[in-house]
């Protein structure tokens, strides 16, 4: 027994001796000494192929592997577009518990696309000092989806049932495409994002507080959608085709190509497809007298079918007269031909809930949306790692048209036809935007990075609404609804930005000036007088970003940022138009809208570049919201300024990769919002607490199969007058790489059909109202993609557009 006890004691001591607090540290850079973020590091026992642990490099390229077992090891490092690196063997034991590896330099890969399968990938989320990056290519269920559906899965981003996009609880988000503003908003922005296939999106840049380099417009911040671009010399092209099946069937097809030599880079895309979806809407309104007694009710069902096709094409050429200079031109054209039919049946009831009359409405719309754009740019680097100067000139033109015929049959309580009305509308619009900007960058004393620039933009819009009452086949002008509105706007801006990285602290300071001159002119008619307005305002917009590393390995980081923003009204919202949806529902413009201003603060903690927690506070004056007014039982929807809005939110975003084949992404947001403003009914004051949560899990299976499950849920929430019920959805997707050239992806959205939009509308004059909308959120999507080509090392320099804010302010209707 004594011998056995001694033997067990020796074994335990030996086992204890082999358990150590080991640490392996290092830094990964490319051949130009630039740190590589999100490179995959694998720890292996010498002569054994299976890794025992994985890590991902931080934003500064550093990594830390904690390991408790003694032995002889080697590490490998991989990153997309780079050759694999393997270290020399090293030992971890009680005498050598820590190993600081020499600098790891990854070399650019030279590959033939048809002959290699890249197994390393970027993480779903990356954190920078002034933005969050979402790598869309890491989401397999993006296949067959649209840009709008991709945005719904991004951390902190919420797309409400009306298509309005909020970021960390804030409205007024500006959408950019490849550093160029979309100049779209409302229904037009929603339509555009639905027409943009997810297969052409590489990354989302989410900036809740954008730096001074970006335009100050957009109280909610900026979401920059970066499309896929080939950065290597050689040639490549890709083709993808997808089909979406729900109640109706839609298709989406995409082609992209790139060819680069020492002197030229030619690239382009072409997308074509059709949209085919629906909204099934139930509306209930209860009318009351001053004592709260019911005087009548209105119940309506509307089935709206939206369909139509279109295409999007772009072509760009870069010329490299020298290694230091790039001259480029980019042209693009977007054509869409949306159509819709709205079949509505509404019944009016008296105070005893007996049918009084009914309305049967048919609203047919036939539209067109054409956007042409040209960008000229030049960039010159005066020396390697030295000053650089970039200039852009942009011209954009939007031509839209919408022909509308609204027919309403009015029936008595017995079902007899009482009257028949027909209203025809013709609504052409034109928007022209001219913009020019310059940007200068220089490093001062090898410490401070200086950025400075200036911008000029001029926008001219013309919106016409011609309405006619059709009686017995004869058209008579309806001057009450007919309107012609013109609007001119000039913005001049300049900015200065300074950035410095100290030992553990990164500081970025910015100041932007913007001066605005605007003029609106409504041409009169026989019923309406001619009217106009002029406005001028000049403002400063400071920004501050701080990022502090609590340790040398960037495992624990603190960040803080502050910024001031402006929310300029959308161009068409200033147009005092009136557009009927049916006999009792109208959309109206507001020429008296004022710009809104907000101050935003954010404090955050980042753990190992995987978990980020943030606290956000904002104070906004004159925020623009949709408002609802009831007059003579008619429902008017118009944009209006909400006097003061304060918002406080707490958020967490987490990314886990516990196994090589398993990935988790979790996001959550708690929001408190307080609205207070003068209103149609007196004072509007809304206090609201709600939460939003999102989860994603991805499995990498054998034989090049990948599976993904994700979902989200939003609790009951309020937005000015709107009270939305809680809703959520679950999505499923699976992907198979058939060969290095061919990938097939299948996914189902809203599997359990829980994404139903319903709620109430508050603060209506002597009226209660609620709604329920069923859309084709549940759908099956199948996408097949093919890619081939040959590429060698070489990168296209990033060129930004000069039109950086105006494109977010264009609307369809």
Please describe what each predicted stretch is.
Residues 483-490, 566-619, 637-648, 657, ...:
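Outer-membrane beta-barrel signature, preferentially recognizing the C-terminal barrel domain
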Residues 103-105, 147-150, 189-191, 218-240, ...:
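N-terminal periplasmic accessory domains that precede
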Residues 180-208:
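Short acidic/polar hinge/loop motifs at secondary-structure boundaries
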Residues 517-519, 553-600, 615-633, 751-765:
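Surface-exposed extracellular loop regions of Gram-negative outer-membrane beta-barrel proteins
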């Amino acid at each position: 027994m004594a011998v056995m006890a001694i033997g067990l004691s020796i074994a335990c001591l030996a086992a204890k001796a082999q358990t150590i607090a080991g640490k392996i540290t290092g830094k990964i850079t490319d051949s130009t000494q630039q740190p590589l973020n999100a490179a995959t590091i694998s720890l292996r026992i010498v002569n054994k192929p299976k890794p025992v642990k994985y890590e991902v490099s931080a934003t500064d390229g550093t990594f830390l592997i904690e390991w408790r077992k003694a032995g002889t090891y080697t590490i490998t490092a991989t990153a997309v577009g780079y050759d694999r690196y393997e270290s020399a063997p090293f030992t971890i034991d009680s005498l050598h518990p820590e190993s600081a590896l020499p600098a790891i330099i990854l070399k650019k890969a030279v590959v033939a696309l048809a002959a290699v399968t890249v197994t390393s990938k970027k993480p779903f989320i990356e954190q920078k000092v002034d933005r969050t990056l979402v790598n869309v290519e890491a989401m397999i269920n993006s296949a067959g989806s649209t840009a709008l559906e991709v945005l719904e899965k991004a951390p902190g981003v919420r797309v409400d049932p009306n298509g309005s996009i909020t970021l960390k609880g804030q409205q007024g988000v500006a959408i950019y495409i490849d550093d160029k503003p979309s100049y779209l908003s409302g229904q037009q922005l929603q339509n555009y994002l639905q027409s943009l296939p997810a297969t052409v999106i590489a990354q989302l840049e989410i900036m809740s507080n954008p730096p001074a380099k970006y335009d100050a417009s957009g109280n909610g911040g900026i979401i920059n959608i970066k499309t896929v671009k080939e950065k290597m010399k050689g040639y490549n092209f890709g083709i993808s085709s997808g089909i979406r099946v729900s109640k109706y069937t839609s298709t989406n097809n995409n082609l992209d190509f790139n060819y680069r030599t020492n002197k030229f880079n030619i690239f382009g895309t072409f997308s074509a497809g059709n949209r085919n979806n629906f909204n099934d809407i139930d509306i209930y309104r209860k009318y009351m007298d001053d004592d709260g007694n019911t005087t009548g009710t209105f119940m309506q069902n509307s089935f709206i079918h939206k369909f139509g096709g279109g295409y999007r094409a772009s072509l760009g050429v870069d010329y490299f007269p020298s290694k230091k200079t790039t001259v480029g031109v980019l042209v693009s054209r977007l054509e869409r031909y949306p159509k819709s039919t709205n079949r509505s049946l509404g019944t009016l009831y008296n105070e005893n809930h007996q049918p009084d009359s009914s309305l049967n409405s048919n609203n047919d719309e036939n539209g067109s949306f054409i956007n042409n754009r040209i960008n000229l740019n030049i960039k010159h680097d005066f020396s390697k790692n030295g000053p650089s100067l970039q200039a852009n000139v942009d011209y954009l033109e939007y031509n839209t048209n919408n022909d509308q015929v609204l027919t309403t049959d009015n029936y008595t309580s017995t079902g007899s036809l009482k009257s028949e009305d027909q209203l025809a509308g013709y609504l052409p619009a034109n928007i022209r935007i001219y913009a020019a900007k310059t940007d200068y960058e220089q490093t001062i004393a090898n410490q401070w990075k200086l950025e400075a620039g200036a911008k000029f933009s001029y926008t001219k819009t013309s919106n016409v609404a011609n309405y006619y009452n059709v009686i017995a086949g004869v058209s008579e002008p309806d001057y009450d609804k007919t309107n012609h509105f013109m609007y001119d706007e000039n913005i001049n801006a300049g900015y200065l930005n300074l950035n410095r990285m100290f030992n553990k602290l990164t500081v970025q300071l910015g100041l932007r000036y913007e001066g605005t001159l605007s003029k609106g002119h409504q041409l009169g008619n026989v019923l309406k007088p001619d009217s106009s307005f002029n406005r001028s305002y000049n403002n400063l917009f400071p920004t501050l970003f701080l990022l502090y590393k609590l340790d040398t390995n960037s495992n624990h980081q603190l960040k803080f940022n502050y910024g001031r923003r402006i929310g300029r009204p959308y161009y068409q919202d200033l147009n005092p138009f009136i557009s009927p949806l049916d006999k009792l529902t109208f959309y109206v413009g507001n020429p008296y809208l004022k710009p809104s201003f907000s101050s935003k603060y954010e404090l955050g903690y980042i753990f190992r570049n995987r978990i980020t927690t943030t606290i956000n506070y904002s104070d906004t004056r004159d925020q623009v919201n949709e408002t609802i007014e009831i007059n003579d039982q008619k429902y008017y929807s118009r944009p209006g300024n909400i006097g003061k809005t304060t918002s406080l939110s707490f958020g967490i975003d987490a990314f886990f990769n516990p196994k090589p084949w398993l990935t988790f992404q979790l996001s959550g947001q708690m929001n408190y919002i307080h609205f207070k403003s003068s209103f149609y009914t007196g004072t509007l004051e809304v206090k609201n607490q709600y939460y939003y949560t999102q989860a994603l899990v991805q499995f990498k299976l054998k034989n090049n199969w990948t599976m993904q499950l994700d979902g989200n849920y939003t609790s009951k929430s309020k937005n000015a007058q709107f009270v939305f019920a809680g809703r959520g959805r679950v999505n499923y997707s699976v992907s198979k790489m058939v060969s290095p050239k061919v990938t097939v992806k299948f996914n189902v959205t809203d599997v359990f059909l829980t994404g139903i939009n319903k709620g109430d509308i508050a603060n209506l004059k002597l009226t209660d109202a609620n709604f329920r909308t069923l859309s084709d959120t549940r759908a099956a999507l199948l996408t097949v993609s093919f890619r081939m080509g040959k590429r060698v090392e070489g990168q296209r320099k990033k060129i930004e557009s000069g039109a950086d804010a105006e494109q977010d302010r264009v609307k369809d209707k």
